[in-house]
Amino acid sequence: MLPMQVPFQRALRLCLQAALAAIASAAHANDGTIVITGTITDTTCVIEDPAGPTHTKVVQLPKISKSALAKDGDEAGRTPFLITLKDCPSSLNNGVKAYFEPGPTTDYATGDLKAYSIAYNNNPATTQNAIIAASEAQGVQIRISNQNGTKIPMGVDAAAQNAQAFNPVTDTANNAKKKVTLRYLASYVKKSGNITAGQVTTYVGFSMIYP
């Protein structure tokens, strides 16, 4: 009888190992899968404005009265700003736009940018670090919009953001290259709560989206 117990014990051990493996697999089963896909283009333009190593543009909103933001959703102080590209390849097609990326200042509930009770100190890196640590301004946020005034929602993908696209033109200084000028708006927007008077600052990163 003893010799016959060896294959039986081996078979039992294999069955137990298979059962334990199945249990472990079930315990670590996913609830779903996120597939992430994208496209990288060899199209290259140089950001001309904002210039400098960090390509930081300062948009100065006008000084306004709290009364201009009387109720939730009111906008005031719409201010245009540009992003200009140069040295684009002559093959660049129409439809270049900016993607305003999510970050620490994004309010996912409102789709606007949180404003902070802090003044800009002309040092982009220091200001960004200070903003994150500063107190959030009450009753007001900053909105990015297209030229026609339609809101560009923050915290969504590029398709949902629906930022206005712009077409390249031949660079008169170099006919072998193209340039692109992108135009958007920034403004104050009223959110729930009482507005506290004082300086406010925020920031948002951007990337260029090519056709």
Residue ranges and their predicted role:
Residues 2-8, 26-211:
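Mature extracellular/passenger domains of Gram-negative fimbrial/pilin and adhesin proteins
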Residues 17-28:
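Hydrophobic h-region of N-terminal signal peptides that target proteins for export
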Residues 7-17:
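Sec-dependent signal peptide recognition
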